[in-house]
Design a protein with these regions (language model features):
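A glycine-rich helix N-cap at a beta->alpha junction
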Residues: 1-16
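Active-site-adjacent substrate-binding region
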Residues: 19-21, 25-138
């Protein structure tokens, strides 16, 4: 057995848009609280992720290299468990998903038009640098 502090899932972290209306959500509430421009990264955690989830969320927001928002991954939120963190949650391990919200933002997601030209490398790099800062502090 190896002790696991937590799992960090990177899901679709390279597509950004400052255009209003570029970000959609599964609930109207999130549109009101998070806005309609897809220009941020999202940290998804659950209360069961405990201190790891709290630390990841707070440190990502505090790092300040890229706008960061958070949401608790309630099962009723469509798509909240559609990535590699799902099985960690299933077996009781703390896990967070760092995402740009995939198909809620990127209309190219899993299509032929999902090409390297659609990646915002400046902001993708900011996400990676921010994660590097956060992981070093955990």
């Amino acid at each position: 057995n190896v002790p696991v502090k937590g799992m960090i899932c990177l899901e679709s972290i390279g597509y950004f848009s400052d255009e209003k209306g570029s970000q959609t959500y599964s609930t109207p509430f999130h549109k009101l609280t998070m806005g309609t421009a897809g220009n941020y990264i999202l940290v998804v955690s659950r209360k069961e992720d405990g201190e790891f989830g709290k630390a990841m969320t707070n440190k990502m927001k505090d790092a300040g290299l890229i706008s960061t928002k958070s949401v608790k991954g309630l099962k009723r939120l469509k798509g909240v468990d559609l990535s590699d963190h799902r099985n960690y949650w299933k077996y009781g391990y703390p896990a967070v998903m760092i995402t740009n919200t995939a198909y809620y933002r990127n209309k190219n997601y899993h299509r032929k038009s999902d090409t390297i030209e659609t990646i915002d490398f400046r902001r993708l790099s900011a996400v990676i640098h921010q994660l590097n800062m956060v992981v070093r502090e955990l």
